[in-house]
């Protein structure tokens, strides 16, 4: 390959990365989606159809609704990983998040760091030392408290930025820090059953996301250009219904069920997204002995992507394991949790396409044992 072809190949890959990883195409036609700001990274939420707006049982629910920080659970810390290596060029792409939440006498606090990384991508077929990495980051600080019995409100402050750097070339993208805010509400009430062996609860939640300052990117290649990008603003509305049962007579066992659903609307669509604003998600979970959870969910999107067909209910599934240290005879109320989810891929015609993506999470809960 000659030098001109090498340069053209590098420029092509550069602009591919500059175009919101894979999806967004311009600052006016599309919002800058599928970043660390809006992608769900926790395996529980993914397997449940990304429908956690009213489910504080999910430790990362405050990513979707700041009022849904886990309540009366002591302290939790977590790490989540979501693969995005759907084809050869994207073999190092990934999302991850780390953070925690805590219940105090003055309310519930949550904090997290989310990141997308393309990994090192070779941008010169003749020089493997020349590569490019695209990274965007979101910092989150959330707070919630009850204002009435069973009624919680919450808010989040976020910082979002992006950088694209090239080793061995002058290509780069930098951005300002965008400061954004979320607000949410959560109502929790007992359901219809109050017997000793069967009880239920119902939650309803809603949130507004990503309102705040302008977001601008500076592109440096052969020329320098500054562009204002639209970050996606969402309205989320949803519910969660939990049914707790005890089965058996002489040998009793806990069997719990959770059903969640969510509607998400893009409030500031770009010129090419005016009819692509409605997202739906739902999930069901069955938990045996409060130890093993099986999950099945799905997402209906107004867009076609590698993970879903437009307008169809696209399934994903997962499993969760809770390991309370009390089973080892320890007196400390500590539980270790592991969650895993699988997302089948819709588009498999690309070079070395995967058939599915995965996500996993590990967390430590202190202050409330599951037993």
Cite the ranges covered by each PLM segment.
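Bacterial N-terminal signal peptides that target proteins for export
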Residues: 1-11
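Bacterial N-terminal signal peptides
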Residues: 9-19
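Subset of outer-membrane beta-barrel
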Residues: 25-371
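Sec/Tat signal peptide C-region and signal peptidase I cleavage site
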Residues: 20-24
């Amino acid at each position: 390959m000659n030098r001109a072809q090498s340069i053209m190949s590098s420029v092509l890959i550069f602009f591919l990365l500059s175009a919101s990883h894979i999806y967004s195409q311009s600052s006016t036609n599309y919002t800058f989606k599928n970043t660390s700001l809006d992608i769900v990274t926790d395996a529980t939420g993914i397997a449940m159809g990304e429908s956690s707006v009213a489910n504080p049982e999910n430790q990362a629910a405050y990513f979707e609704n700041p009022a849904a920080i886990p309540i009366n659970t002591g302290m939790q810390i977590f790490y989540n990983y979501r693969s995005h290596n759907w084809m050869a060029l994207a073999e190092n792409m990934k999302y991850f998040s780390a953070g925690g939440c805590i219940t105090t006498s003055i309310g519930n606090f949550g904090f997290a760091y989310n990141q997308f990384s393309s990994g090192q991508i070779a941008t010169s077929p003749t020089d493997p030392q020349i590569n490019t990495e695209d990274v965007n980051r979101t910092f989150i600080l959330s707070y919630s408290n009850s204002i009435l019995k069973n009624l919680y409100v919450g808010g989040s402050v976020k910082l979002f930025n992006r950088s694209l750097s090239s080793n061995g070339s002058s290509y780069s993208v930098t951005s300002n820090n965008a400061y954004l805010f979320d607000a949410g509400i959560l109502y929790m009430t007992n359901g219809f059953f109050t017997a000793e062996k069967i009880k239920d609860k119902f939650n309803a939640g809603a949130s507004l996301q990503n309102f705040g300052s302008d977001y601008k990117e500076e592109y440096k290649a052969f020329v320098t250009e500054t562009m204002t990008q639209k970050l996606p603003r969402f309205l989320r509305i949803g519910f969660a219904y939990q049914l707790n049962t005890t089965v058996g007579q002489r040998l009793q066992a806990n069997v719990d069920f959770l059903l969640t659903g969510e509607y998400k609307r893009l409030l500031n669509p770009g010129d090419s997204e005016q009819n692509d604003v409605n997202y739906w998600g739902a999930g069901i979970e069955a938990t045996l002995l409060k130890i093993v959870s099986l999950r099945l969910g799905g997402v209906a999107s107004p867009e076609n992507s590698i993970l879903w067909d437009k307008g169809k209910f696209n399934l994903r599934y997962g499993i969760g394991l809770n390991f309370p240290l009390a089973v080892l005879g320890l007196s400390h109320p500590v539980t270790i949790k592991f969650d895993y989810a699988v997302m089948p891929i819709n588009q498999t015609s690309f070079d070395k396409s995967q058939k599915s993506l995965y996500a996993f999470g590990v967390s430590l809960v202190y202050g409330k044992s599951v037993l």
